[in-house]
Amino acid sequence: MQDEHRTAFLLQTVASELRDVTRLFRMDPALWEETHQPHFIWHAWEGDGRFHCRFALGQEEHHGESHIPACEDARIALLEQKRALKRLCKQTLYDLCKRLTGVTPPWGSLTGIRPTRLVYEAMEHGLSLEAACAQVGEIFDVSPEKRQLLRDIVQVQSTLPPPCEQEMDVYVGIPF
């Protein structure tokens, strides 16, 4: 798949999640409308083996970049690339909004995901609970208080028996 077409395909579902990021900062939804002045302008592309993303609002802009994940299985590679590009776009917009407003949300740039899932993923890659919480906190700009809450929740969950294949989880209340 050509770089430009792959990037366009990967970005098809990210628009609503970008709006979630601006909601963290209580920004006017009209900033996404081209008829509103100023309005968000953004562009994502591939170059030099990396994903790039740029957001601008008025005279302020922010650029981000990340590596393009590779995998031998093309289907898994496409999913990982979509995830990486979406994360890059959300983080780049988050950084711009944080600079524009001076606000730092307690959960940082996390939207639409259970934070414990990210901790478990990091632990599956060999990190300790402390290191995993620190990594999630650094990557997503999570406050120290919320990092501690993450650590406490994962610690409590680790005492519970793992689910069997024929069982499912039911969330009654999520403390996030």
Feature locations, PLM:
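Short, charged N-terminal beta->alpha structural module
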Residues: M1-D28, S143
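Short gly/ser-rich anion-binding loops that grip negatively charged ligand groups
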Residues: L79, R83, R87, S109, ...
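Short, well-ordered secondary-structure micro-motifs within conserved domains or adaptor modules
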Residues: Q2, T22-Q81, K86-C89
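Generic structural signal for hydrophobic residues
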Residues: L18-T22, L93, A132
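Local cysteine-cluster metal-coordination motifs and their immediate loop/turn environment
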Residues: S109, R114, Y171-F176
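Conserved, surface-exposed functional patches that form binding/active-site neighborhoods
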Residues: L85-P105
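N-terminal [4Fe-4S]-dependent radical SAM core
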Residues: C97-T104, E124-Y171
